[in-house]
A protein has these predicted regions:
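Aromatic/hydrophobic beta-strand junction motif of beta-rich domains
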Residues: 1-3, 346-364, 493-531
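Feature for extracytoplasmic/surface-facing segments of secreted or surface-associated proteins
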Residues: 1-306, 313-326, 330-335, 526, ...
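Extended low-complexity, serine/threonine- and proline-enriched intrinsically disordered segments
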Residues: 10-14, 357-407, 449, 512-544, ...
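Extracellular Ig-like/FN3 beta-sandwich strand-entry sites
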Residues: 43-45, 442-446, 565-571
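Short beta-strand elements
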Residues: 68, 327-328, 461-487, 580-600
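Short, compositionally biased P/S/T/A/G/V-rich stretches that sit at domain boundaries
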Residues: 237, 268-270, 318-351, 467-511
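Signal that preferentially marks extracellular ectodomain short beta-strand elements
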Residues: 276-279, 405-442, 551-566
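Beta-strand-rich modules
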Residues: 449-451, 563-582
Length: 600
């Protein structure tokens, strides 16, 4: 059982053909990834699910079997399960499942292997390798495990269930629906130079070098000794980087020791193992995007820098730090808005949160404008939005149709800014938004960001990155409405809903609210809970950080001079992220002054 590394803290659940759970909570070995044995009784197609974490990410994987025996659970077996059943992840483990003939499973297996052919060859595997039961050693980074390391697998539902495959060591996207494949992935000729066991060894050294302040600053074995001479590190994405191994290491060590950043001392925790990101090969030394995530002593995760990279020099892998001078990020987010004090229809909305620092780059030019575009399945570049410098704030703001309309304006000469740090790009709720999401599934998640030094978006920026950069979107936006509502959303307990509706606090009095919830399915790592008196959550009455597996939050604060009435608008916002970085945001609202049936 693996996703390139053995799942940590994982358990297995098995459903019989009727949808009845015949095994739950069966532990998975954290060292070998093995599970079972589990006895199957009856005939038909059994569904097997394992959920846990890989490095800093939550992961659920699935498999189908008619006969039992050895069954791996990996992203590849998940792809087979989705294509053979015709069900997306939101529906796969719900209800009864009609028997799937062995011939159908075999045909889907062949379809997937055909799409994976270049990656199978790179991993040294035969074209007919058994993805369901072939030899697999989690964490070995060779053979089947290398395949899991180097191929990105996304699952979802459009008009049909689909699988999207991308190569981290090459280019292209293979898009599969039951019985059909569009596009293809390729592996770079220099892919063999990406020595993953050696990259793993670098991170083992980095884990040791960041274990304590003394280890971090050690002149012989400390962080600087593991960084490239051209390494870059920043206090935050909106500030210029410090360059060189010594200065970059100092910045990171000071951040970990609480001297820089938000003042939190992180030593006493640990750096988490990385999972491989997209690699740049062919021209120059191999460079791969990596995660640099530190888990503090309380179990909370801190991402140190964005778009971090490691580079393989003649002497081996070293940490490069910031891949880009302009450390832009893009994250897909889905918001579920639910009224909890009375009956009303739920609503969902999709966003791309594109954060582009309003930075002064090398040479002194200031970033004033950026044009963001994606590719469609035919390779055409499609503009999504412009972002401009608002004159304040840390990030460029969306160039909108008007000051009261967040619809993006695609004309840099016509439009308006709606304030500082307006990074959210809304996707339309209908076909237009679906088309944008569909392009990410069929043509890959790369976003091109063209950079300009003038507000007219006409003069290319001169900096270390050149006039444009490419970043990957974290999280695949769900396409079908059922896929949006079928994400692993938290469901507040009835008592939590009632308590939010009844919550009232006198001026200058203490507020206490302790909501609890369950999740509709596994695969969401929580990170924050907020209690707010406005829909934008611009004012926060209370907030708290959450552990990934949280099922409750303790919110408390002392109110100011304005009382909170029981019939006032109140918002509980819970946020978390899925395996591929998709952010899920539940906005649970109470507005008892409005009639039932109306949205807040």
């Amino acid at each position: 059982m693996a996703g390139g590394l053995a799942l940590s803290g994982a358990t297995v659940r098995v459903l019989d053909p009727s949808g009845k759970a015949i095994a739950t909570g069966k532990a998975v070995s954290a060292t070998t990834g093995t599970y079972g044995p589990i006895t199957l009784t009856g005939t038909g197609t059994f569904r097997v699910e394992a959920c846990g974490t890989v490095a800093d990410k939550p992961l659920c994987v699935w498999g189908l079997t008619n006969t039992g025996g050895t069954l791996h659970l990996t992203p590849m077996t998940s792809a087979i399960a989705v294509l053979a059943s015709g069900l997306g992840p939101e529906a796969l483990m719900n209800g009864a499942l009609a028997a799937i003939p062995d011939a159908t499973l075999a045909n889907v297996h062949t379809q997937l292997r055909t799409a994976l052919a270049p990656a199978l060859a790179d991993a040294g595997l035969a074209a007919g390798f058994d993805l369901l039961a072939g030899a697999l050693t989690p964490g070995a980074h060779t053979g089947y495990d290398r395949l899991l390391d180097t191929v990105g697998v996304s699952l979802g539902t459009d008009t049909k269930a689909f699988v999207s495959l991308t190569s981290r060591l090459g280019s292209g996207t293979a898009y599969l629906e039951p019985g059909t494949t569009q596009g293809s992935l390729s592996v770079d000729a220099a892919a063999a130079s990406v020595d993953l066991p050696a990259l793993d060894a670098l991170f083992a050294k980095l884990i040791g070098a960041t274990a304590s302040n003394a280890a971090c600053v050690n002149s012989q074995t400390g962080l600087a000794s593991l960084m490239d001479p051209n390494a870059r590190a920043s206090i935050d994405p909106a500030t210029s980087a410090f360059t060189g191994a010594t200065q970059a290491a100092q910045i990171i060590c000071l951040r970990l020791n609480g001297v820089l950043g938000e003042g939190e001392v992180m030593f006493g925790g640990k750096l988490l193992p990385t999972t491989l990101g997209r690699c740049a090969l062919g021209a120059g030394d191999p460079l791969c995007r990596v995660d640099f995530v530190y888990q503090n002593s309380k179990g909370f995760q801190r991402r140190l820098g964005v778009e971090q990279a490691a580079v393989k020099r003649g002497s081996g892998w070293v940490l490069l730090g910031n891949r880009l001078e302009v450390q832009a990020t893009a994250v897909s987010r889905v918001v579920l808005t639910r009224r909890v004090d009375a009956t009303a229809a739920d609503s969902t909305a999709r966003y791309l949160d594109i954060s582009i620092p309003a930075l002064t780059v090398s040479g002194g030019a200031v970033l004033q404008c950026a044009r963001v575009s994606q590719l469609d399945a035919s390779g055409n570049s499609l503009p999504l939005a412009f972002f401009k410098n608002a004159g304040s704030g840390s990030y460029l703001s969306l160039w909108s149709a008007s000051s009261s309309d967040a619809t993006p304006s695609l004309d840099p000469a016509t439009g308006a800014l709606r304030g500082a740090d307006q990074v959210a790009l809304p996707l339309a709720s209908g076909a237009a938004g679906d088309a944008v999401a569909r392009n990410f599934a069929r043509a890959g998640r790369a976003l091109q960001i063209d950079l300009y030094s003038d507000s007219a978006c006409a003069t290319p920026l001169s900096g270390l990155d050149g006039a444009s950069i490419s970043i990957d979107l974290a999280g695949l936006p769900p396409i079908a409405a059922a896929s949006q509502s079928g994400q692993p959303w938290p469901a507040l307990a009835t008592a939590a809903n009632s308590a939010l509706a009844a919550l009232k606090v006198a001026a200058n009095a203490k507020l206490t609210y302790n909501p609890t919830w369950t999740t509709t399915r596994a695969g969401l790592a929580f990170n924050r809970a907020q209690l707010c008196p406005d829909k934008a959550c611009s004012t926060r009455l209370a907030e708290t950080e959450l552990a990934a597996g949280a099922t409750t939050a303790a919110l408390s604060a002392t109110l100011g001079s304005t009382a909170l009435a029981d019939n006032a608008y109140k918002l509980l916002r819970l946020t978390g992220r899925t395996l591929d970085g998709l952010v899920l945001q539940l906005d649970a609202q109470s507005c008892s002054a409005l009639p039932a049936g109306s949205p807040c």
